[in-house]
């Protein structure tokens, strides 16, 4: 079918579809889901099981190992990592990156079945294993509800719950999570002396309250035709009921609990998590939106709702925006419109300057139709607007006009030779239609590995491929339909009598090309030398994995030595908070203690329930000040907190590992692992640029152990469990049961009234009771007390113990270069015993996995490109000539990065992939034209020079518009390096296409001037 001819004959049909593209594009932009970043599925689940009283070794052997063994038999399991603490097992299951999203819910169901299977094999006293598969939920709209000292935690909690209840009703809201709520408890304070005087054992209180407060089934009774449920109601309704509970002493006397104990409300101490916002106690409120919704619109509705609710809040309570994804997405879309307008203006202006005003309007209109059609099709494919898809439009901007440029240039050249306008526009589009399609497909195929690569990092940029594929295919269709239609009434070119190429510019180019062809071997050798030189320079250039984003935020993880409690963490973070709030550039400071906050940013790391951990989120007034303030904060902490480990960072789009550089040593013996890790740490200490050097297991923690004696214990009638219960009552409180108040459950804790005054010395004299009510001290039931230092955690990787030597790069130090220096030194310094191995983790692991994922589909891409070339050119030599041009783009890549000062990173690699397609696309246009002229009977040398001369404008315009269209992205923190890569590479590729490719072609075909 002759599409150009059909477009002119059926103009009304084409006009209709063009109107649909514009209207659909406008509607698509208004209704497409908008988010800050592309959504990618975090294919991991977290398993948690508590085993109170067990050491990390016991937790590992009795809880972690059985669960891991069962889970490992699951389908598509990629990694299993675990951490065994005192009384707690944490296991993370990561699925194969290639797992389709549709299979994940089924796999998590299978995981739960595996957990149910292993539960009966866990030791008595182990809790039920909880499975959290919503690990990757993002609460991108994040607030902090803070109060001054005049409010209780209950009042703060009530208001937080009220806001949560209101927020879940907003259309588009999926979940609302609260963070930092304090757990209300009922404390029963007793004096051991009083209990001894009244002859009441702690076990009596435990048994009595546990039996009285439990809900039991009392059965049912048939009465005539009615089945009557029998209900027993003896649970505590008020604290007075609890205080009135009767206890029977060893002598048989009865006493009220309130007579021998103090019953009062309180909060769990120490708390598991805490939060502060701008120096005030707070509760975090994270809002997660549904997939595909317009977060800008949903966020506006949330802000409107909260504005009305905050007006009802009491004085002294404040709601602070901590991270507004809706505002960030709105700004990104506004920036996109500006960048898009700039790119369109640049592209059209260049075309107008070179090809004329009418040609500029003609080609520029095809650009708008391509963008509108892409937005329309994105709706049907379920794609949304985000940082990656918007960048895809900017990247595609220059390439979208390539096909229209070729068609328009062909038509103009034909009209210059006297052809009728209708004939010129039809033949100008019809003649190169297959070569343009092939070149378009090649450009799309070059980005194909991004879409197919099975890795979370590659998944981030998949929308970029979708945008490019849709828009480029549309541009080809429009070049055969809209361009001839518009060109038939817009193009006006006066025929010229002579050769249109007989100008000063073309004559100068002919002389240059003749010289290049005459010195062909020298040209080839020079270009080869430049290629080798560029590879050498590339090896010396700084490289990075993912760039930092230009947000007015930075965050910091704070870690104290293992063994510190959350109150120690609080004291340190309060001082840091005071310093940060005193900085004039700082707008808001929020802190979480005990764990990271809800995942408000997709690429955030998650750390749960560590009392020695804190996280700080700092917002600044101006994003240009972020790096300077972060650097000052690092210096302040380093100078004033010698025991604190701090890792602050700007925001990145990749998941953040525990450390940038990690060498993991795998084996069985803890002492051997620690020795191997210590050697690697010594290397890090000696290497300039390495900071935050640490052991992944942390420091050994102090342990105090009463050595229970069965002989002594049996003689006085005190069991090991009774001794342990007595210590628990004196140190943290023993759980008696739950007090229910509405929908709230409060633990009832039995505590020694002197709970805060015990130390390791007077604990030895702690009174304990035997069954007859007699009182003894702990030391009477033990063979002494042992004080030791042991690992506070045992970490495993795929069911093997792993200990990591970790570090981060210092300020201004390149991660890749530091890793390369460390890797060589560690390999030399660490001798691995038999049965032990070393594995690289950290950013290098992520980068290697991402690169391997991309490389997995590179052969497919090359095969597809080769097939297209063979179909177009129908021989072998011409495809080889074209493919030989690909490695030479490295010359331009190095030039672009060096001139702009950018670092080669993951997005530069994406740009490199795109360059392959762009370069081949330009080369195809030239090589096919050479073949056409040779087939028409022209002398090979004349065909070579004439084809090159005729393709200068289309090739230069296609490359020039792409290069200049990249300008708005050059200053983007995320895609700047990719823009520099494409701009530099394409500039050199253009020169190669019009200067070097003819030389290589002449060498392959032995073409010489007659």
Q: Where are the language model's segments positioned?
A:
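A structural signal for conserved, well-ordered secondary-structure elements
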Residues: 4-7, 12, 30, 34, ...
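Hydrophobic regular secondary-structure detector
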Residues: 1-110, 114-115, 272-624, 632, ...
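Generic hydrophobic, helix-prone segments enriched in Leu/Val/Ile
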Residues: 122, 131, 135, 160, ...
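Alpha-helix initiation/capping motif
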Residues: 152, 386, 503, 622, ...
């Amino acid at each position: 079918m002759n599409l150009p001819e059909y477009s002119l004959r059926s103009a009304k049909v084409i006009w209709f579809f063009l109107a649909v593209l514009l209207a659909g594009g406008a509607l698509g932009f208004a209704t497409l889901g908008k988010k800050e970043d592309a959504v990618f599925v975090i294919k991991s689940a977290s398993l948690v099981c508590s085993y109170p009283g067990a050491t990390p070794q016991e937790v590992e052997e009795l809880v972690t190992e059985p669960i891991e063994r069962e889970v490992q038999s699951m389908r598509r399991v990629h990694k299993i990592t675990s951490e065994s603490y005192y009384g707690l097992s944490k296991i993370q299951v990561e699925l194969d990156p290639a797992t389709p999203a549709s299979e994940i819910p089924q796999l998590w169901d299978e995981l739960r079945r595996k957990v149910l299977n292993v539960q009966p094999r866990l030791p008595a006293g182990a809790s039920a294993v909880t499975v959290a598969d919503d690990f990757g939920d993002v609460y991108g709209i994040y607030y902090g509800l803070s109060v001054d000292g005049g409010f209780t935690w209950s009042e703060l909690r009530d208001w937080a719950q009220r806001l949560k209840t209101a927020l879940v009703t907003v259309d588009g809201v999926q979940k609302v999570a609260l963070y930092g709520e304090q757990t209300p408890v009922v404390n029963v304070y007793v004096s051991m002396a009083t209990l001894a005087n009244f002859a009441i054992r702690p076990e009596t209180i435990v048994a009595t309250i546990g039996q009285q407060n439990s809900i039991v089934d009392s059965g049912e009774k048939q009465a005539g035709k009615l089945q009557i449920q029998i209900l027993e109601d003896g649970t505590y309704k008020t604290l007075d009921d609890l205080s009135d509970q009767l206890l029977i002493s060893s002598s048989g006397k009865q006493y009220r609990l309130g007579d021998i104990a103090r019953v009062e409300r309180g909060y769990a101490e120490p708390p598991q998590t805490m939060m502060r916002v701008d120096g005030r106690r707070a509760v975090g409120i994270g809002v997660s939106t549904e997939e595909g919704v317009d977060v800008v619109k949903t966020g506006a509705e949330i802000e409107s709702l909260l504005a009305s609710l905050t007006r009802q809040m009491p004085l002294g309570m404040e709601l602070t925006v901590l991270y507004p994804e809706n505002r960030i997405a709105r700004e990104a879309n506004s920036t996109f419109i500006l960048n898009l307008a700039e790119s369109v203006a640049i592209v059209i202006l260049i075309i107008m300057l070179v090809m004329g005003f009418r040609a500029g309007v003609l080609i520029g209109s095809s650009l708008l139709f391509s963008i509108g059609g892409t937005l329309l099709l994105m709706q049907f494919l379920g794609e949304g607007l985000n940082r990656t898809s918007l960048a895809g439009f900017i990247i595609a901007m220059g390439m979208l006009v390539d096909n229209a440029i070729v068609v328009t240039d062909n038509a103009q050249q034909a009209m210059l030779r006297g052809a009728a306008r209708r004939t010129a526009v039809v033949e100008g589009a019809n003649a190169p239609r297959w070569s343009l399609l092939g070149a378009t497909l090649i450009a799309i195929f070059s980005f194909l590995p991004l879409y197919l690569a099975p890795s979370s990092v590659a998944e981030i940029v998949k929308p970029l491929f979708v945008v490019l594929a849709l828009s480029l295919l549309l541009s080809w269709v429009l070049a055969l339909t809209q361009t001839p239609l518009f060109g038939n009434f817009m193009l006006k070119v006066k025929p010229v009598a002579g050769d249109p190429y007989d100008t000063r510019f073309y004559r100068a180019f002919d002389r240059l090309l003749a010289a290049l062809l005459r010195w062909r071997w020298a040209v080839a050798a020079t270009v080869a030398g430049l290629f080798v030189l560029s590879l050498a320079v590339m090896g010396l250039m700084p490289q990075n994995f993912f760039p930092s984003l230009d947000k007015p935020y930075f965050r910091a993880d704070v870690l104290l030595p293992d063994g510190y409690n959350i109150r120690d963490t609080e004291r340190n973070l309060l001082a840091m908070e005071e310093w940060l709030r005193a900085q004039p550039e700082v707008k808001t400071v929020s802190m979480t203690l005990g764990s990271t906050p809800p995942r408000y940013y997709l690429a955030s790391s998650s750390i749960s329930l560590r009392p020695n951990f804190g996280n700080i989120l700092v917002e600044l007034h101006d994003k240009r000040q972020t790096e300077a303030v972060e650097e000052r904060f690092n210096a302040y902490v380093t100078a004033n907190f010698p025991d604190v480990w701090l890792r602050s960072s700007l925001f990145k789009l990749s998941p953040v590992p525990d450390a940038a550089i990690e060498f993991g040593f795998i084996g069985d013996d803890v002492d051997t692992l620690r020795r191997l890790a210590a050697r690697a740490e010594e290397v890090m200490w000696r290497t300039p640029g390495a900071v935050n050097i640490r052991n992944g297991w942390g420091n050994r923690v102090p342990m105090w152990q009463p050595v229970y004696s069965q002989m002594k214990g049996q003689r006085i009638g005190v069991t090991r469990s009774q001794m342990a219960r007595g210590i628990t009552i004196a140190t943290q409180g023993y759980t008696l049961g739950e007090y229910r108040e509405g929908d709230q459950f409060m633990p009832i804790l039995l505590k020694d009234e002197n709970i805060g005054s015990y130390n390791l010395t007077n604990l030895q004299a702690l009174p304990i009771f035997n069954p007859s009510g007699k009182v003894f001290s702990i030391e009477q039931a033990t063979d002494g007390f042992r004080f030791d230092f042991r690992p506070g955690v045992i970490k495993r990787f795929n069911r093997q113990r792993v200990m990591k030597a970790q570090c981060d790069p210092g300020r201004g130090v390149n991660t890749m270069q530091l890793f390369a220096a460390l890797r060589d030194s560690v390999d030399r310094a660490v001798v691995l015993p038999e049965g032990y191995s070393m594995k690289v983790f950290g950013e290098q692991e992520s980068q290697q996995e991402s690169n391997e994922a991309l490389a997995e589909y590179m052969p497919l891409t090359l095969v597809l490109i080769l097939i297209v070339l063979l179909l177009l050119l129908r021989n072998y030599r011409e495809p080889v000539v074209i493919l030989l041009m690909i490695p030479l783009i490295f010359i331009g890549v190095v030039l672009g990065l060096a001139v702009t000062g950018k670092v080669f990173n993951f997005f530069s690699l994406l740009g490199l992939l795109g360059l392959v397609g762009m370069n081949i696309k330009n080369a195809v246009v030239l090589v096919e034209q050479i073949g056409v002229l040779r087939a028409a009977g022209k002398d090979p040398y004349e065909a070579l020079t004439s084809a090159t001369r005729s393709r200068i404008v289309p090739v230069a315009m296609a490359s020039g518009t792409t290069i200049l269209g990249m300008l708005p992205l050059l200053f983007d923190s995320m895609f700047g390096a990719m823009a520099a890569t494409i701009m530099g590479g394409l500039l050199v590729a253009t020169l190669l296409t019009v200067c070097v490719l003819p030389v290589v072609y002449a060498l392959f075909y032995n073409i010489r001037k007659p």
